[in-house]
Regions:
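Solvent-exposed beta-strand sheet faces enriched in polar/charged residues
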Residues: 10, 229, 249, 278-280
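C-terminal coupling/interaction segments
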Residues: 258-296
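Short, flexible helix/strand-to-coil boundary loops that buttress conserved ligand/catalytic motifs
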Residues: 92, 221, 241, 267, ...
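ABC transporter nucleotide-binding domains
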Residues: 4-7, 14-185, 190-204, 210
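Alpha-helix C-terminal capping segments
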Residues: 65, 70-71, 98-105, 118-120, ...
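ABC transporter nucleotide-binding domain
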Residues: 170-258
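A generic structural signal for alpha->beta connector loops
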Residues: 108, 180, 243, 271-274
Length: 296
């Protein structure tokens, strides 16, 4: 295990019947980082987390957690976990759940500290079973962090949350990293990864396609985003071979293209009234699309 890594999968294979979930996956979470794991549905993200946590065993390859087997109690006591599917006793109040889970850890946060950090104090005395779906996710997050974890696993934590609740969770995650926690986060929200991640890992069909900073991931793709005001129609521009897609945003067209220089030349040659022309590098969304296409 790399000395800077807290959790690591090495050449891990996992099948469920005839379905290949992981196909030689190598993945690690480094000390002090927030790692965002991206991938389409069925890419193997949840399976990878489950093996790192010792909930599943790999068919081939190895998993380590704090340099130990994931099944070791000493390793597990340094974790916080929030999976996609969570069952908690519906009759217990949120504060009671936090206190119960905190009692398993050697140096936990108090229930009040956990709720303060996650802004869930208004849920403290409510039975878990009476909460909405989004409120349950917020309560699960408070429970996941109450043990003051060195490593926090969050599997699609913001699904079902409104924008304000998502931003509250983002703020809490930044605070946890500042306090010394490392975090593995899976998400479908690319802006979440772009905003939070120190490093991004892209998984498709059970394989690691690439990993790096957001800027490094963007550099993998040749696409650029062009915005302009033009008299040309969407249909005219979409017909150009370098153009992947075109959309209108208020008075401007937004064009995603390979070979942006050729598209700019065409625009200038075709429309004397062209205005507000700007060219931007690809965002994480374009990079993600291109990288996962390679696995198709």
């Amino acid at each position: 295990m790399n000395n800077g890594s807290l959790a690591e999968l090495t050449n891990v294979h996992k099948r469920f019947g005839k379905t290949v979930a992981l196909d030689g996956l190598n993945l690690q979470v480094d000390r002090g980082e927030l790692l965002a794991v991206l991938g389409p549905n069925g890419a193997g993200k949840t399976t990878a987390i489950s093996i790192m946590l010792g909930l599943l065993k790999p068919d081939e390859g190895s998993a380590s957690l704090f340099g130990q087997s994931p099944q070791e109690c000493a390793a597990r006591r340094q974790l916080g976990v929030m999976m996609q599917e969570v069952y908690l006793a519906p009759e217990l109040r949120v504060r009671e759940h936090i206190k119960l889970v905190a009692s398993y850890y050697p140096d936990p946060l108090s229930a009040e500290e956990a709720m303060e950090l996650t802004q869930t104090k208004t849920l403290a005395n409510r039975p878990y079973g009476k909460l909405s779906g989004g409120q349950k996710r917020q309560a699960q997050f408070a429970i996941a962090i109450c043990g003051r974890p060195k490593l926090l696993f969050l599997d699609e934590p913001t699904v079902g949350l409104d924008l304000q609740a998502r931003e509250t969770m983002w703020s809490a995650l930044r605070s946890l990293v500042d306090r010394g926690s490392s975090i593995l986060l899976t998400t479908h929200y690319l802006e979440e990864a772009e905003s939070l991640a120190d490093r991004v890992a892209v998984i498709a069909k059970g394989r690691l396609m690439t990993s790096g900073t957001v800027n490094e991931i963007r550099a993998f793709v040749s696409r650029k985003r062009i915005t302009c005001r033009t008299a040309l129609s969407i249909e005219q521009i979409q017909a150009w071979p370098e153009v992947e897609r075109v959309a209108r945003h208020q008075q401007h067209l937004q064009i995603v293209a390979n070979g942006a220089e050729d598209v700019v030349r065409r625009l200038l040659a075709s429309d004397e009234t062209l205005e507000d022309l700007e060219v931007h590098r690809a965002g994480l969304a374009e990079a993600f699309t291109e990288l996962t296409k390679e696995a198709a």
